[in-house]
């Protein structure tokens, strides 16, 4: 299995007649962070529960560091989970919460105290040992939950939507802390979220799931730039989809032609295709050819940019423009496309 540390082979999971995971194959390299991303009900949390040993697969095998753990209990998998709900004991001090797993393993008091101290220092909570859960903030509670997992030094660390209960600013700081610690400690990690920004921020690779299947696995930048289906294109950020034509690297939309230098990376034959345009790929200018002309339908000020809906060739085209490049007085403009943010899909999609 080479450097593959966590491997799922031909995994199927059914509940009654309902198949929620359909012949899934997945491998994670030692020391990497991979995120399962997808809409509600796609199967991502079920995969995490299968890895943890909280569910058993109907078919297939699970390996950790080369060992078949398919039938092993959660206690025998050397795995820790950071939950969305934190799952802290309110009647225990922070130190006792973090050291609870060590105590259950029979680790002596002196060693336990030292390891708890080190774990709290890792999550920037040095000196919090004697406080209680109701004396700290939600963000601090999540860091306590993270310290409780790290103190056990697991082979695999699982994250089950750990930031869902935090506000936007805390989510940002916590995902940075999680990524920093995961890289510093080199812990193989599997992360579950429905939040694209979160997935992009913490991951070496992102796996997008839908209806119990893996749709695409790649680094975040590649997923966004080269989606392999309409589902991926719509799920990984906003885009406008147009009918187009590809001929030797030149793309035609509404009689407007432009060269796409990396067209070969989409592995399409010349001919009809679908062209996806991200909002940031569009520049609205005051001059252009007739086939570039669009009509401004609406514009909403979002703070650092304008979110604009235009009509181009009879279809809506979403545009994000900076305040310097757009005025509310504009009724018409001309579409200029940049190569970054334009992608191609098979017409059959």
Swiss-Prot record:
Pfam short name (any one): ABC_tran
Subcellular location: Cell inner membrane
Bilayer disposition of the protein: Peripheral membrane protein
Listed GO CC annotations: ATP-binding cassette (ABC) transporter complex
Keyword presence, Signal: no
Reaction catalysis annotation: Fe(3+)(out) + ATP + H2O = Fe(3+)(in) + ADP + phosphate + H(+)
EC number of the protein: 7.2.2.7
Coiled coil segments of this chain: none
Lineage: superkingdom: Bacteria
Keyword Lyase: no
Annotated residues for binding of ATP: 38-45
Recorded GO MF terms: ABC-type ferric iron transporter activity; ATP binding; ATP hydrolysis activity
Keywords of this entry: ATP-binding, Cell inner membrane, Cell membrane, Ion transport, Iron, Iron transport, Membrane, Nucleotide-binding, Translocase, Transport
Ranges of residues in domain ABC transporter: 6-236
Assembly and oligomerization: The complex is composed of two ATP-binding proteins (FbpC), two transmembrane proteins (FbpB) and a solute-binding protein (FbpA).
Known function: Part of the ABC transporter complex FbpABC involved in Fe(3+) ions import. Responsible for energy coupling to the transport system.
Family, per entry: Belongs to the ABC transporter superfamily. Fe(3+) ion importer (TC 3.A.1.10) family.
Annotated protein name in UniProt: Fe(3+) ions import ATP-binding protein FbpC
Natural source organism: Histophilus somni (strain 129Pt)
């Amino acid at each position: 299995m080479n450097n593959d540390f966590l491997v799922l082979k031909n995994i199927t999971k059914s509940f009654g007649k309902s198949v929620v995971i359909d012949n899934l194959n997945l491998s994670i390299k030692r020391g990497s962070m991979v995120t399962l991303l997808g809409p509600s009900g796609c199967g991502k949390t079920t995969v995490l529960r299968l890895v943890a040993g909280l569910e058993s697969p109907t078919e297939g095998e699970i390996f950790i560091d080369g060992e078949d753990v398919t039938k092993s209990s959660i206690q025998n998998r050397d795995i820790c989970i950071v939950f969305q709900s934190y799952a802290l004991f309110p009647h225990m001090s922070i130190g006792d919460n973090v050291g609870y797993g060590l105590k259950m393993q029979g680790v002596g008091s002196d060693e336990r105290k030292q390891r708890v101290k080190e774990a709290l220092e890792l999550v920037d909570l040095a000196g919090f040992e004697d406080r209680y859960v109701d004396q700290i903030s939600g963000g601090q509670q999540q860091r306590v939950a993270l310290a409780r997992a790290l103190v056990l030094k697991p082979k695999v660390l699982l994250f089950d939507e750990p930031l869902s209960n935090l506000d936007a600013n805390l989510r940002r700081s916590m995902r940075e802390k999680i990524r920093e610690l995961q890289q510093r400690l080199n812990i193989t990690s599997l992360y579950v979220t429905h939040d694209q920004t979160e997935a992009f921020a913490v991951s070496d690779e992102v796996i997008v799931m839908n209806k119990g299947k893996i749709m695409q696995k790649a680094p975040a930048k590649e997923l966004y730039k080269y989606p392999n289906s309409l589902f991926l294109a719509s799920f990984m950020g906003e885009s406008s989809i147009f009918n187009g034509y590809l001929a030797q690297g030149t793309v035609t939309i509404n009689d407007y032609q432009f060269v796409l230098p990396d067209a070969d990376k989409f592995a399409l034959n010349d001919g009809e295709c679908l062209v996806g345009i991200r909002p940031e790929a569009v520049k609205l200018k005051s001059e252009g050819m007739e086939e570039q002309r669009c009509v401004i339908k609406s514009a909403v000020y979002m703070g650092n940019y304008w979110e604009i809906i235009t009509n181009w060739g009879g279809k809506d085209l979403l545009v994000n423009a900076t305040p310097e490049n757009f005025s509310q007085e504009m009724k018409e403009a001309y579409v200029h496309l940049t190569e970054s943010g334009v992608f191609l899909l098979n017409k059959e999609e």
